[in-house]
Amino acid sequence: MKMTAPLMVTLLAAIGLALPSGLLAAESCVGCHAEKTPAAVAQWRQSAHGKAGIGCESCHGSDHDRILKGEAKVDLTRCAPCHPKATKEHQASRHGLGLHTGWGCTRNLPDRKKDECRFCHRQGDEAPSTLVQCARFLKQSSEMAHVGCNSCHMVEGSCDSCHSKHSTDLAIARDPASCAKCHMGPDHPQWEMWQTSEHGILNKSAGRKLGPDCQSCHMPAGTHNVSSGITMNSGGVPYPAGQRAKARDEMVKICSGCHAPSFARRELEQGDAVRSQSLAILKEAEETILDLNTLGLLDPMPDHRPPHPLSGFQLVTDAQMLYEDTSHIERLFFKMKKYDYAKTVKGAYHQNPAYAHWYGNAELKMDLIDIKSEARRLKERKKAEPGQAGIEEELRSLKGRFERGALSAGDYAKEKARLLDRGN
């Protein structure tokens, strides 16, 4: 006869034996929660935790008032003591930086919540555990920050981002749909790319043995380090050569489970080439905007708009750039960098021709056309104003390019001499 937890409690009590502490704690909760949250109790009873006698208090603690207030979070610190290997792998991966890359210090916000401090500070420790900030997060309302940002970025400290809360059925975490909750949309549509790639189509028609899924390539052998084999940061910028070479060897090894190593390396190197070409297009657009800023032609200029949460009244074109409180040309650049560059590069690495070309590369190049056209319009508008000194403007633009490293000292001197000769 299969012995249920309640029956075990009754029998052990009847013969005077001590109850396992976890099971005893669990039963003190189950009596009430079987009525109030029956689904959670049913899931726990069928889980590995329930069958091993790991009770509610082991994860939730015993302070019922804090639990009801939502203050007793079941986060990674609760899971780590029993799952040290998975925790170490997770923390070494990009998922281990998920919260910090999507967060920002809220101490100066009028509607800040005090419990947010715990994401970057340990209890009683003023030194932050990370200096990473996210300007876009800081511009959102608290509701949007929770729903639209933290729902995904909590993956750093919340195991139930991928696993369920009370069930321990690994089929849930092994389902690629669990990745789609976050890895989809205009800025990183890996889910859509995989679904419509040859890998995804084979997976749907013939299963994992013929068509690999997210976990096959990014969590081989069940590792929680989802960053194995990744050669660039989340913004698509390549890692240093040594780190990149090591990661490439890791990915070739993963691909070699189905493909010849030489074939895998060639395919990945094609992705590298697409990345380099795309980055050059992106840099050309960025240089156009930096030049307009030097000339004072952005509309509005950074000092005539609400301050950037991290940089104040400075132009920002890096990973902290905003999609609000900017000029129109910066809005075009945001789409180019955050959406179209990412689709081009990640589409290439995920072997999806439509995302690499039409959704990515074509849009990237048309973005550059739009940005250059807008730059010409702004410059022509300035020329139409009375008292415009053309040579002085060109010299200022030239100096700005030199100071940003876009021109060598030799080229700067040559172009400067040419402009001065023209002005004489």
Predicted regions and their residues:
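Positively charged n-region of N-terminal signal peptides that target proteins for export
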Residues: M1-M8, H100
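Intrinsically disordered, low-complexity segments enriched in glycine/proline and serine/threonine
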Residues: A5-M8, E126, T223, S397, ...
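Low-complexity, intrinsically disordered short peptide segments enriched in small/polar/basic residues
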Residues: A5-P6, L12, E27, P38, ...
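Alpha-helical, heptad-rich or low-complexity scaffold/stalk segments
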Residues: P386-N424
